[in-house]
Every structure is written in structure tokens, then in C-alpha cells.
Amino acid sequence: SMLYAIGIACVKYSKFSYLNTLFHLMLPEYSSPDSSGRIYFLNKLHPCYWDKDDLNQLNGTNYKTPLSTILSKQLRPYFQKEIFLESEYISTFCIFEYLLSLNFKHIGGLSYAPDWAPWGEFRWRTMIFMRGNNDLYSTFFAQAESQKNNWEPIKQGMFDGKYEVYKKLKTKIQTSTSTAH
């Protein structure tokens, strides 16, 4: 939950360079000078790391994204003073998870499942966001399309500071999450 707490705060306060650094952390025991054994933190900790059915069974729930939903509910009280509206919190949470998914794909993903990327609440909430109007989530990612290399996450170094890298990753993520079960 620490990853998520830091991530939500980074999104809320537009600290994307910090978030980028967090996403690129490596596990020390796997670090090697020639980068052949590089294992990124995100490869071991993401919202799909644990089996959905096992988590639901343990918690007596039937969530589409159990870890994401549990973390969202668990962390909400800590952001009450900074994020007043529930809708803003949910949007901020989903922005973080989508950025996590994009960055997971960007740093290399899983060698044995190159087309896969983790997904969270953003996967099923996107349709809800699209039906509403003036929501933070849709606006945030629409800014990428209009601002391109001037979009704040890109300006702060995410996606190698290039809109084209982001756009390719976004297409890959949309493909992988639309075919995920």
C-alpha cells in the first residue's frame, strides 16, 4: 500500500518525476552492472500480482480488481484532507494505476508474457468516466493528446520525455487490457 500511497500523492501534486523514479526502482538482489539481471520493483508489485479469485475468497468479496479495490478503500481515509471529493479521489487513484500500467510496459514488462500489463480499477471505471462529463481522469489523459511533449508527466521525464513513446505504450495497454479476462 506504500507504493499506492506515494503514487496517489505524486499524481495529486503533479510530482511525476518522483513517480517516474519510483517506477524505475530496482530490487537490489537482482541488480547487476551489465543490466542482464535487472528486476524492477514493478515486476514484483503490481495490482495483478496476486490471483483475483484467491484475493476475493480471502476477503469474502467478488471484486473485478480485488487488490486495487481493497487498496483504494484502505487508503481513502489518509487522503480525506487533500482530496475532498470521492470522485476526485477515484479519478486520482485510477490515473495512478494507469500510469503504473503504462510504466510497467515501458520498463519491459514480463519476458514470458510480453503483451501483458497489469490493470486495476481504471480498466472497468474508464467506461464510467467516459459517460460522465468533466471528470479528472478523462481530462488528464486528454491533455496528453493536446499537449503532447508539453504534457506534465512527459515534461517531467516519464516515457523518456517523448509523447510518441507514451502513445505507443497507450495503444499496447489498451490492447492488452481489452483482451484480459
Language-model segments: residues:
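Charge-rich interaction segments
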Residues: S1-G7
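Short coil/turn connectors between adjacent alpha-helices in alpha-solenoid helical repeat scaffolds
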Residues: G7-S17, L58
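Charge-dense, extended regions
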Residues: Y18-H181
